[in-house]
Amino acid sequence: MVVPFKNEPGIDFSVQTNVERFNEELRKVKAQLGQDIPLVINGEKLTKTDTFNSVNPANTSQLIAKVSKATQDDIEKAFESANHAYQSWKKWSHKDRAELLLRVAAIIRRRKEEISAIMVYEAGKPWDEAVGDAAEGIDFIEYYARSMMELADGKPVLDREGEHNRYFYKPIGTGVTIPPWNFPFAIMAGTTLAPVVAGNTVLLKPAEDTVLTAYKLMEILEEAGLPQGVVNFVPGDPKEIGDYLVDHKDTHFVTFTGSRATGTRIYERSAVVQEGQQFLKRVIAEMGGKDAIVVDNNVDTDLAAEAIVTSAFGFSGQKCSACSRAIVHQDVHDEILEKAIQLTQKLTLGNTEENTFMGPVINQKQFDKIKNYIEIGKKEGKLETGGGTDDSTGYFIEPTIFSGLQSADRIMQEEIFGPVVGFIKVKDFDEAIEVANDTDYGLTGAVITNHREHWIKAVNEFDVGNLYLNRGCTAAVVGYHPFGGFKMSGTDAKTGSPDYLLNFLEQKVVSEMF
């Protein structure tokens, strides 16, 4: 009997023994860094001469892993492997596939601290964020395993005299998973194993910055007994293999989390029917946001300031749900801005090995992009705090607040994906909602208000996929807050929802006359 779903707990680092144990795990992981990461195709580990490096963004001289690069020939072999494995994997019962995923989750639970420690080094994640990432990966796997069991018998439809009808679900084939670097375990594991538990096979192209983290999942899948070829591991240069994976005639679906530019490119290319392709491809895309916290008058200003700061600067603003815009009623704007500045100036920034609140941004490209937006912000508004940058040893950017901005300003319209938040002063709640919707994106949002009628207005008019009342706009929890957005934030395929597996299933109807 499968026990009811329960979210995986984090680790309480206010307890000294937990701190000591995690420090020991960091030492163990650090001693093993620099290893070679192979491709994995049909269960075979392939080490290539053409490689790239994964480095610690907090200490760029520290090699995390030397990664083999997949070629287009390797991708062809991976598709052959996945297509072959699909013929038997799709015949596994729903229950057997789900139980295998539960074994995977149990192994991850046993290795949670190891996986978390790897993310501290490879992704520059603070301790709590790293542990939360690993725990969320467990949650996704546990949740999807149970979801598959619930879908096993299909859904009831009507019979009539002399006719029995069945409506049930079947897998669709081989697909491609392209996960992001910012949740290198949780999103990677969830978007890989959701289609797998549904009976499909996958080519997993991990994010280049966090390959070691993704490779740990491959080790765990092998230990759990996943058949060879069900998941094939193909790290590589997106410019060399990205389009090839998406365009391939055997790609039935692409699940992608990342930038708007890449997501729309995938969507466009997936619409082209290739020679020999007998189906329409599905795209499941999450492409970021320009998320806002709206603050009404007559609110708890301490709560509002804390919600803005934690949502803006957690994991250095490198969350698609991060608060990038603070839209504040004129009656409380100055007070909340001042409190937010004070809270921000207390945040610690540094190498997350030392358990700082904030660590580096992920790579040089992101560092340069964010630094450029800070310069733009200085021209468009007033720099209130932060703005400093340092890439001498790692990619560090101070938590930065701008005020005096207008909705049309670039730093209020374009996704920065870093520790930068802009304040806009509005005259009333109607204007606040108007400004909040003045964006191409619609992922998350929050409203701080004590006016029930204003909250109802936000529910009906604030055009985001995930809306929160009197809290920040980050930290969706699997099973409680299915996650996905509107507009240019993606296809709104809510992860961690009862409907998510339907993205990887076809519905079949069988009518039997008697």
From Swiss-Prot:
Gene Ontology terms: biological process: glutamate biosynthetic process; proline catabolic process to glutamate
Keywords: NAD, Oxidoreductase
InterPro entries the UniProt entry points to: Ald_DH/histidinol_DH (IPR016161), Ald_DH_C (IPR016163), Ald_DH_CS_CYS (IPR016160), Ald_DH_CS_GLU (IPR029510), Ald_DH_N (IPR016162), Aldehyde_DH_dom (IPR015590), Proline_metab_enzyme (IPR050485), RocA (IPR005932)
EC number of this enzyme: 1.2.1.88
NAD is among the record's keywords: yes
GO cellular component, one term: cytoplasmic side of plasma membrane
Record field: catalytic activity: L-glutamate 5-semialdehyde + NAD(+) + H2O = L-glutamate + NADH + 2 H(+)
Gene3D superfamilies for this protein: Aldehyde Dehydrogenase, Chain A, domain 1 (3.40.605.10), Aldehyde Dehydrogenase, Chain A, domain 2 (3.40.309.10)
Superkingdom in the source lineage: Bacteria
Family: Belongs to the aldehyde dehydrogenase family. RocA subfamily.
The name this protein goes by in its record: 1-pyrroline-5-carboxylate dehydrogenase
Species of origin: Staphylococcus epidermidis (strain ATCC 35984 / DSM 28319 / BCRC 17069 / CCUG 31568 / BM 3577 / RP62A)
